[in-house]
C-alpha cells in the first residue's frame, strides 16, 4: 500500500519504519478552551504525523487559537499531517476546527485525516473508514466509501477488535482484554471460524439459554483487511500500533 500510518503512544519504539510505516504520534488532545494539550516528547522527535483526540472536550469555544497551536506544533515537529481521532457526535466547535485545519493543511502541503462524520467539514482531507462491523461486509463498506469520497480520499482505519456480543448482535460488544479472550477460548474450546466478509475471526457460545458471539482480530485478519483495501484501490490505512507492533513481521512478511 502507498500510505500506511502506525498510531503509537509517545515514547513507544517501533520497527515499523522497515516496513515503510509512518508514525502517527498519539500525544495530543483538544482540551478545554479549546487549546492544544500534549504529552512531553523528546526534543529530537520529528517527522511522521500528529494524532489528535478530543477525550473529555466539552465542545465549547472558538477553535481559531487552538488551530494556530496545532499548526505551529506541526511546523516545530516536522509533522506531515494530522489525524483527527475524534469520537462521538461532531460538535460545532470541532467541525469548525476541522474546516480551518483542512484549509491550512491543503495550503501548506500537509494531509488531514478525519472520521467519516467530519468528512463534509474537510473537503480536501482523507476520510477514515473504520474496519469494525457486525453485519454486512467490509468490502461493501469500503466500496461505498470510495464511491462517496473517491479512492484517493478513502483510508481504512483498522481496529484491533476483541468484543463479546449477546445475540442477536447490534452496535458494539463488550470489550475483552487479551487475557480474557485467551481464557475464554481455553475454557470453552470453541470452533473458531474466519468470516471473509467481516475479515475477522469469531466463535459462538451459550450461557444457559442465551447465545453469545465473540469477534476478534489476529495478524491474519489485519493482513486480510489490508489486502482487501489494496485490491479495491484504496491505498491508505491507519493501524493501531500498540496492538500490532509485536506482529509486524507476520502482517508484512511480503509486500502488500
Language-model features: where?
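A structural motif corresponding to the C-terminal end of an alpha-helix
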Residues: 74-79, 104-110, 145-153, 224-235
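Chitinase-like catalytic core of GlcNAc-active glycosidases
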Residues: 1-134
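Alpha-amylase-like alpha-glycosidases and glucanotransferases acting on alpha-linked glucans and related
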Residues: 121-151, 155
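Short acidic, glycine/proline-enriched helix-loop-strand junctions
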Residues: 92-111, 194-206, 246-256
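Generic structural signal for well-ordered alpha-helices
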Residues: 67-71, 95-102, 139-146, 226, ...
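Short catalytic/ligand-binding loop motif for oxyanion handling, primarily in non-cytosolic enzymes
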Residues: 91, 121-122, 163-167, 245-248
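Glycan-binding loop/region signatures in secreted carbohydrate-active enzymes
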Residues: 153-225
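Acidic/aromatic/glycine-rich contiguous surface patches that form carbohydrate-binding/processing clefts
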Residues: 225, 231-256
